[in-house]
């Protein structure tokens, strides 16, 4: 057999392989992307859209596995995990670090790495890390938030309207008109809701002047 005949047979085999791969790729039906779920879902190919039964009113579409089931029809057991009677009692596997906060696992890892170092170096590094963590935690202390959600939570706790500062414990209907007919008491109330009691007592100019006067009276040596 001539060399050019061998090359021709090899080229023919490669063409057959390419055609076969192309037909396989064309036969693949692209499915929509589904996000990962916490529990296993029903197998693919059994959804109401693949069976063409999504338009029938007797079928109810499941929100978790997107599978159709009939209300008035007996079926053999739950078709999805969330349809089990004890689904509300199912729990995820326990986290081994659930009793620790977000910083303690990092601290434990740092201790395991610093074990071969001398004792004084270990104490210095851990003290610096703890000081930094304490400063970060103190930067966003509790009850000092100034966001809209924090204002709403504070107003709900103090039973005031977060828009206009109207007291809600009077059980009287009111029209929220923020910025209009704002008296000194309402402005102080709104400042208290927006800044919080701690920041309002420490940073409000009126309270700051009073605190300065008391400090001057207490620290005056006369």
Swiss-Prot record:
Source domain of life: Viruses
Region (Disordered): 1-21
Compositionally biased region (Polar residues): 1-12
InterPro entries per record: Viral_NABP
Pfam families named in the record: Viral_NABP
Its job: May act as a regulatory factor during viral transcription.
This protein's name: 23kDa protein
Biological source species: Indian citrus ringspot virus (isolate Kinnow mandarin/India/K1/1996)
């Amino acid at each position: 057999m001539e060399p050019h005949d061998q090359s021709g047979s090899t080229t023919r085999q490669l063409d057959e392989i390419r055609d076969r791969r192309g037909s396989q790729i064309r036969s693949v039906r692209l499915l929509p992307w589904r996000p990962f779920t916490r529990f296993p879902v029903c197998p693919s190919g059994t959804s109401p859209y693949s069976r063409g039964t999504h338009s029938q009113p007797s079928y109810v579409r499941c929100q978790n596995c997107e599978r159709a089931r009939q209300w008035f029809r007996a079926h053999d057991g739950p078709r999805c995990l969330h349809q089990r009677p004890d689904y509300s009692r199912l729990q995820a596997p326990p986290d081994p670090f659930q009793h620790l906060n977000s910083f303690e696992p990092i601290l434990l890892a740092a201790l395991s790495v610093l074990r071969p170092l001398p004792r004084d170096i270990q104490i210095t590094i851990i003290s610096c890390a703890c000081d930094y963590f304490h400063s970060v935690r103190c930067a966003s202390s509790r009850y000092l938030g100034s966001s809209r959600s924090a204002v709403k939570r504070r107003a709900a706790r103090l039973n005031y309207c977060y828009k206009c500062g109207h007291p809600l414990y009077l059980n009287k209907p009111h029209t929220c008109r923020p910025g209009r007919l704002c008296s000194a008491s309402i402005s102080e109330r709104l400042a208290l809701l927006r800044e919080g009691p701690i920041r309002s007592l420490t940073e409000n100019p009126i309270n700051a002047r009073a605190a300065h006067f008391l400090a001057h009276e207490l620290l005056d040596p006369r």
